[in-house]
Amino acid sequence: MPEYRSKTSTHGRNMAGARALWRATGMKDGDFHKPIIAIANSFTQFVPGHVHLKDLGQLVAREIERVGGVAKEFDTIAVDDGIAMGHDGMLYSLPSREIIADSVEYMVNAHCADALVCISNCDKITPGMLMAALRLNIPTVFVSGGPMEAGKTKLADHNLDLIDAMVIAADDSASDEKVAEFERSACPTCGSCSGMFTANSMNCLTEALGLSLPGNGTVVATHADREQLFLRAGRVAVELCHRWYGGEDPTALPRGIATFEAFENAMTLDIAMGGSTNTILHLLAAAQEGEVPFGMRDIDRLSKRVPQLCKVAPNTPKYHIEDVHRAGGIMSILGELARGGLLHTNAATVHTRTLADAIAQWDVTQVDDDKVHTFYKAGPAGIPTQIAFSQATRWDTLDTDRSEGCIRDVAHAFSQEGGLAVLYGNIARDGCVVKTAGVDESIHVFEGNARVYESQDSAVKGILADEVKAGDVVVIRYEGPKGGPGMQEMLYPTSYLKSKGLGKHCALLTDGRFSGGTSGLSIGHASPEAAAGGAIGLVRNGDKILIDIPKRSIDLLVSDEELAARRTEQDAKGWKPVEVRPRKVTTALKAYALLATSADKGAVRDKAMLDG
């Protein structure tokens, strides 16, 4: 049987010094024979999705110790993409994912922890911790801080989220008073932003990967039911320790759970619920860390056969994450996918032997269990707060309408084509991604003239100055992992296109990425990126670009001979932006750029550069 990793520092005469230090943290004689379980928290007062996490690590710690483990908590960093957006702060967002993964690895390996509880929530924190978990491959369970409640105002006929505040602010016809009302109403509570944006998408995907508990992605942060998720996560961490160190059960480890089949399940869910395109980036990165051969071609294959069963903001103003929970949460979406023959239901989870067992226990349309039904009735209270577990409001009824409700069955899907697609062509040889759930069907095939910008800042200025016209394809390049560096999100350009009335009349193509709040014909992750010699760096103003989502293609309508000539010219000039960009690229960012791969590889470090 495997020995506790912690035995390295807790046993033997030569470890007297280490034990003395452990004792100084509060450990007693009897603790040195127990598993030491690390709790990676991510509390910060900078991020609404993390502002309520301060005491939750200790909540988990007490439960771990109650059931026989030793708990030791530490914190990672957390960047708020919304606050960092629109200025040089966004250069740090994606690189922070690697820092988070490294920090978890450093703490866990330096102290020889036996298991891990990841308390995450927002955009780069869940992916960073997921990457670390798959690197470390020790018993791990995820529990998130939960989604924010949707905002409410008398000035709108639908609930609000962050994107509504951004779009109205860019609308010149909106009064200052209306903008202020939206701003004050859009983000009423602690938690990750209330739509199917990156944070919530990733927290939902951990359920499909099998690494978190039912409800992890959908119980609002303010609800008392989420406290039980934290307590149960502590108990599960100890159970996983017993299964691995006491029984050498490989399905107690992340790599035994998050297999190729589990990654296919997670991507299938992502496509079915129209999740953020960033999830593709993060799943690819996590797969690389876990040595799982899951890539863009697999995503492309899945996108052609998985229907869209759930439609949530920003793809529709009608539903937010709180509505997904009322409809049965992720387990109900997985249930519909399973009945459609679209899942590997034999995949393991941290809480059941198989995913099939989990669905059988938690799918509200199949289970006649009052406790399960009551759990999924947990709803918002509509009271602004930054306090976790501060309310116990419940919906009167569940939404189990699978023909016209928030979650549909396969026969009544919102679309038989899923919510995400991978496009290939001469402008993106290694692929690019589009959130089809947010694209109006009238522009699924689009041909337009290129309007080229060498930075997000220039594109924003151009859009606001009315340089972009209906029928244009806005091209924003040198914003990839290397070129940015840091692969900025392009939420401001897409929001401003909407505010100018061009949301259904233009396309946007970039080697950068998009916020989970983006909708419209927004195509990101163009690979290879311009800074790596990608063809997006060869586009010139006025070039015709043809986008065909049904055919999964995107092409620059320029002859091969002309492209070859342009490439020769660009090789001589160097693959860098023509304009001088007023951004400060620090040593830390340069170090990230030096090793970063393009988006089709998850923008992870190029290990060949390190190994070679």
UniProtKB/Swiss-Prot annotation:
Give the N6-carboxylysine positions (modified residues): K124
Question: Which cofactors does this protein require?
Answer: [2Fe-2S] cluster; Mg(2+)
Physiological role = Functions in the biosynthesis of branched-chain amino acids. Catalyzes the dehydration of (2R,3R)-2,3-dihydroxy-3-methylpentanoate (2,3-dihydroxy-3-methylvalerate) into 2-oxo-3-methylpentanoate (2-oxo-3-methylvalerate) and of (2R)-2,3-dihydroxy-3-methylbutanoate (2,3-dihydroxyisovalerate) into 2-oxo-3-methylbutanoate (2-oxoisovalerate), the penultimate precursor to L-isoleucine and L-valine, respectively.
Q: Which Gene3D superfamilies match?
A: IlvD/EDD C-terminal domain-like
Q: What is this protein called?
A: Dihydroxy-acid dehydratase
Q: State the EC number(s).
A: 4.2.1.9
The record lists [2Fe-2S] cluster as bound by: C122, C193
**Which biological pathway?**
Amino-acid biosynthesis; L-isoleucine biosynthesis; L-isoleucine from 2-oxobutanoate: step 3/4; Amino-acid biosynthesis; L-valine biosynthesis; L-valine from pyruvate: step 3/4
| Positions of the catalytic residues | S515 (proton acceptor)
Q: Does the keyword Lyase apply?
A: yes
Q: Which organism is it from?
A: Xanthomonas campestris pv. campestris (strain B100)
The molecular function terms of the Gene Ontology recorded here are: 2 iron, 2 sulfur cluster binding; dihydroxy-acid dehydratase activity; magnesium ion binding
- Family the entry assigns: Belongs to the IlvD/Edd family.
InterPro entries tied to this protein: Dihydro-acid_dehy_C (IPR042096), DihydroxyA_deHydtase (IPR004404), DiOHA_6PGluconate_deHydtase_CS (IPR020558), ILV_EDD_C (IPR056740), ILV_EDD_N (IPR000581), IlvD/EDD_N (IPR037237)
Subunit note: Homodimer.
Please tell me which top-level EC class this enzyme sits in. lyase
Alphabetically sorted, this entry's keywords are:
2Fe-2S, Amino-acid biosynthesis, Branched-chain amino acid biosynthesis, Iron, Iron-sulfur, Lyase, Magnesium, Metal-binding
Q: Does the keyword Lyase apply?
A: yes
Entry's Gene Ontology cellular component terms? cytosol
Q: Offer one example of a GO biological process linked to this entry.
A: L-valine biosynthetic process
Q: How is the cofactor bound, in the record's words? A: Binds 1 [2Fe-2S] cluster per subunit. This cluster acts as a Lewis acid cofactor.
Binding residues annotated for Mg(2+), in chain numbering: D81, D123, K124, E489
Its UniProt entry gives the catalysed reaction(s) as:
(2R)-2,3-dihydroxy-3-methylbutanoate = 3-methyl-2-oxobutanoate + H2O; (2R,3R)-2,3-dihydroxy-3-methylpentanoate = (S)-3-methyl-2-oxopentanoate + H2O
